[in-house]
Structures are given as C-alpha cells and as structure tokens.
Amino acid sequence: MHGFTSRMLGLVSLVLLLVGVASADAQSPVTMGGVTAAPGTLASGEFKVAPRPGDDGTTIPFSIINGTKPGPVLALVAGTHGVEYPPILALQRLRTSLDPKTLSGTVLIVHVANMPSFLKRTIYYGPTDGKNLNRVFPGKKDGTLSDRIAEVITHEIIERATHVIDIHCGDGNEWLRPYSYWVVTSAPAVAEASKQMALAFGLDHIVIDTERPTSPGESIYLANTAETRGKSGLTVESGGWGQTDEASIARIERGVAGVLRHLKMRAEGPEPVTQAVWLGPNEVLRSKFTGLLYPVAEPGQTVAKGALIARVTDFHGTLLQEIHSPFAGEVLYVVATPPINEGEPVGFVAERVAGPEWRPKK
C-alpha cells in the first residue's frame, strides 16, 4: 500500500509539473480598447479620444494579432501623418496576412494614428490644432487633440510593447528614398537592440540619430517615446508624395517580416541587411521665404558640398533664395511641390560615415 501511495503521489507530482510547464509555455489573452484577442486569434477595435472644447475628439483604429506562444510584443504604427499612405496600406495587408496560429508573441497594429489628418488630407499638422503629432509625445490627457492622440498611443500601445516601429513615408509634398532612423541617445543595450531591429527591417540607408531627447516626459517623437522607456524603437521611411505605389508598400511588408524573424516571432522572413550605408552628419534644409519652390536635386542623389538643392522664388517668379548642401552627402528627401512657407523644409541631406560607431565630435 505504501508503495502504491508513493507511486500515486509521484504521478500526481508529474502531472502538476507538466501542467505548470504547459502553463508557462501558454500565451495569454490580450485585451485593450474593449476587445480581447485570445491566443491564436485576431481582434480589432478603436480607441476613443473624447471630445473637448475646440474639437470633436476622434478614434484610433487598431488590431491585435495574438500568437499561440509567449514572445515579444511588437507595435506597428502607421498614419502618424495622415497623407503618408503606403504605411497605412501595408498594415492593412499585414492584418490579414499574419497568421496568429504561427506567431509567437503579439503584434499590435495602429492602422491610422492621426485620423483627423487622414480624413482632412492635411500634411504635417493636425487640422484642428495645427500641431505635428510626431512632435508632441508622450502627449497630454488635457491637451489639444494631437496631444490627446499621443497620450492614448503612449499609454495603450507603447507602454504595452517591447518593440515599436513608427512607419512613415514622405508626406504628401515630399519625395524620398527609403531609409530609417537609428536613435543612439538611449541606454546602450536599448540602442544596440534598436540597431539590430533597423538592420532586420532591411532598409540599407540608416541615419545615426544622436539628437533625440532622453527624458520620458519630453520624448517628442513616437519611436523615441519607446526608447526613453527602455524599449527598442525604430522609425522607417518608404514611399511619399501622396502615392500608393506597390514597391513602397511591399518594402514595408518585407521589413516587418524581417523584424518578426529577427525577434523569433516567426520562423521565416528576409535576412537582415549586411551592407548598410551609415549616415552621420545631417541637416534639414529650410526656406527663408514664402513663395514657390523649385527642387533641383533628387532623392538618392550624391551631392558635393555647395551643390544646389533647390530654388525659391516669389509669386512673380523673382529668385529669392538658392539653397545649397552644407556638406558632401546624399539627398534623402526633397519637397517636390511648389508651395513653400518661410521656415519649412525643402530637403534633407546626410553625410556617409564609416560605420555605426560614428558619433559627432564634442
């Protein structure tokens, strides 16, 4: 009898151990915005941004793709600027192409972060408050509409995630070559993880960004909001000029697939880029005048120091300004439509450096 009891106790212990292991390996449901995605399922909903005096509020559509096994939480955000269409369309596709049953971890998708700008087709700024959403993070609960959108994204998405990709393209007036920003002002381990994520995304031109704020309360930019909270962050650019071209959309899809493979959230995906072009010193070139812009340089063009990038005229055609590159480098984007206001960007130039170790001289 004693032997039988011992065997039974041993069997019960084994069963409990196996149940414990299975529980440790099981994915949990994910709930946010009033919807729940069980393991191995997809769920979609909307965050509500309540109205305040001066605006009607808005909604932020999102999807949860919850895998069957535990793993990272990757947040993908599109539509921070409303006329940046390829990121929005790429995430529409990814919502249905990512199979949650073959996924480890969770993918959180923000389909259109800036719905007011998207519906009103406004570049740069929100139509109700004139603010650039990607300059007001982490946001304010009692602020203007852009502030409140940023606060919801910070609280509901960024703070839930382990990795964040803010997916952009050139705005409706911008023509650009694909590239990404790698922020190095975060903690060394976070910066290294973010670098590996940039390589995994696969865009071969990577700007080494050394000027982002380090305070979580003054993070300003969406991806930097993740980094100041100890999470890997990345900003990528693919497409522009209000276009919906297949190449720009597919490039984003491939990039996300590469990151999912890198994070071991999926078994398959593209290899990381191995021959990156690292870009160090950079400058956004701006107009000193309001008038008409005539771009001369093109995205992807290598230019010498002093090369002509653009001209600005008044509304009668009289030349007001010639804008030149301050150094030899590569043109990453130009504003490609005629309207230009004083102080607005006309182009972005960056200088090639030897590798990711580059830092500005102090």
Positions of PLM-derived features:
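Structured catalytic-domain cores with a bias toward divalent-metal coordination
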Residues: 2-5, 24-362
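Bacterial N-terminal signal peptides
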Residues: 10-20
